[in-house]
């Protein structure tokens, strides 16, 4: 089991969030426990990986009730919202005389509930309107999660749902120079040390801090990277991962191109590894569409030379690296602060404890099915994670002859 799942918080004291928000959530849960409800639903919104669904699970544990979840993969039009959410929330156990809740309803990714303007077109018409009815009439607590709060607020009935809910933004800090940021880093560091101790692993303190700062505030990504680093038995490889971070910073922020090029002679990584890091983090560094276009134009040329070096002339390898190092030369609006750089997705897969060989064969099989490359297919694994929930996946698995280990990696 992946560490992010194995060490997912189960107790409310394990949640990594500011004290004010945590206390507000506890008071909301206690209002249901004490039959003193003011707001019947709780909205948790924020970026992926900030703990929205985990928080809902922990609250269910706190209330000692089962969690009934309707997520983005379920059909969520008006009829299904009535049938599943409304029935689950309105009717308590008929054999119970308790006036406290006997279940917690989770509506996950509510900002993805779309409403058709024309009822005849079907789809998600009326879904949010019915969700409003649930929020108003429920006899059990309802938690609604979303990534795009402002998009949800602009939808039909969205604002009224918000007005009838306690709203918590899952954002651990506002600025990196405030007290909340330091508290968040310390809590993450404490959690990482706890996980490493339970797993019998160790990493230098500086490496752990680097992992946290590369991924924050995405706690899930922090733990995923922690696992990938800790499972790498070769300290030299771990040092290479830390070292590449400094080169990425220099690529995006250094004003001395010649100095950057000369420093590659001391680098302990190959050009393809470097190009993957730049590609992964380019969109986090530059926001202007024209800047991104120009930077990707440069990177595509570097990638072409990198591929040619494997097929024709190894001497082209160094040229590909020098070209990639020049991405910032074509950018007008540079980011003044250092971004949250993360390890390339494909490198994470290769580095994880699930096995380099298994990851490689999985990508090769999916790439062959789609007539593309392994580098391309890694960006579409999210699609196969959705397909995996359906009966159709069994047929695909048989066609590709996927092993149990390969299936687990999707």
From Swiss-Prot:
InterPro entries: AAA+_ATPase, ATPase_AAA_core, P-loop_NTPase, Rep_factor-C_lsu. ATP binds at residues 46-53. It holds the Pfam family AAA. The keyword Nucleotide-binding applies. One of its GO terms (biological process) is DNA replication. Keywords: ATP-binding, DNA replication, Nucleotide-binding. SUPFAM superfamilies: P-loop containing nucleoside triphosphate hydrolases. The keyword Nucleotide-binding applies. One of its GO terms (molecular function) is ATP hydrolysis activity. NCBIfam families: PRK04195.1-5. Heteromultimer composed of small subunits (RfcS) and large subunits (RfcL). Part of the RFC clamp loader complex which loads the PCNA sliding clamp onto DNA. Belongs to the activator 1 small subunits family. RfcL subfamily. This is Replication factor C large subunit. It comes from Picrophilus torridus (strain ATCC 700027 / DSM 9790 / JCM 10055 / NBRC 100828 / KAW 2/3). The lineage of its organism: Archaea, Methanobacteriati, Thermoplasmatota, Thermoplasmata, Thermoplasmatales. The gene is rfcL.
């Amino acid at each position: 089991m992946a560490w992010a799942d194995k060490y997912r918080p189960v107790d409310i004291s394990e949640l990594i969030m500011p004290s004010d928000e945590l206390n507000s959530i506890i008071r909301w849960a206690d209002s249901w426990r004490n039959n003193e409800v003011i707001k019947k639903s709780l909205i948790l919104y924020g970026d992926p990986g900030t703990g929205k669904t985990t928080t809902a699970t922990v609250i269910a544990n706190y209330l000692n009730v089962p969690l009934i979840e309707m997520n983005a993969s379920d059909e969520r039009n008006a009829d299904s919202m009535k049938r599943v959410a409304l029935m689950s929330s309105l009717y308590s156990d008929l054999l119970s005389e308790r006036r406290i809740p006997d279940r917690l309803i989770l509506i996950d990714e509510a900002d993805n509930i779309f409403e058709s303007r024309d009822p005849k077109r079907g789809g998600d018409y009326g879904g949010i309107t019915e969700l409003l009815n649930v929020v108003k009439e429920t006899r059990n607590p309802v938690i609604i999660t979303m990534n795009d709060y402002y998009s949800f607020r602009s939808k039909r009935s969205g604002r009224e749902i918000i007005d009838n809910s306690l709203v918590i933004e899952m954002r651990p800090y506002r600025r990196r120079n405030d007290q909340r940021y330091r508290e968040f880093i310390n809590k993450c560091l404490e959690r990482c040390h706890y996980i490493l101790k339970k797993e019998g692993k160790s990493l230098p303190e500086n490496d752990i801090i680097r992992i946290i700062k590369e991924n924050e505030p995405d706690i899930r990504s922090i733990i995923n990277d922690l696992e990938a680093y800790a499972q790498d038995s070769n300290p030299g490889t771990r040092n290479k991962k830390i070292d590449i971070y400094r080169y990425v910073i220099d690529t995006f922020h250094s004003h001395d191109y010649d100095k950057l090029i000369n420093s590659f002679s001391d680098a302990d990584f190959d050009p393809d590894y470097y190009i993957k890091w730049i590609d992964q983090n380019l969109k986090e560094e530059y926001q202007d569409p024209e800047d991104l276009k120009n930077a990707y134009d440069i990177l595509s040329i570097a990638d072409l030379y990198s591929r040619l070096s494997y097929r024709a002339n190894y001497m082209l390898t160094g040229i590909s690296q020098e070209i990639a190092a020049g991405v910032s030369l074509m950018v007008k609006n540079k980011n003044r602060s250092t971004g949250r750089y993360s390890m390339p997705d494909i490198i994470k897969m290769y580095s994880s404890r699930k096995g380099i060989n298994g990851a490689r064969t999985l990508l090769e099989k999916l790439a062959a099915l789609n007539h593309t490359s392994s580098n391309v297919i890694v960006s579409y694994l999210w699609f196969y994670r959705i397909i995996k929930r359906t009966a159709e996946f069994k047929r695909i698995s048989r066609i590709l002859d996927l092993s149990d280990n390969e299936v687990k990696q999707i």
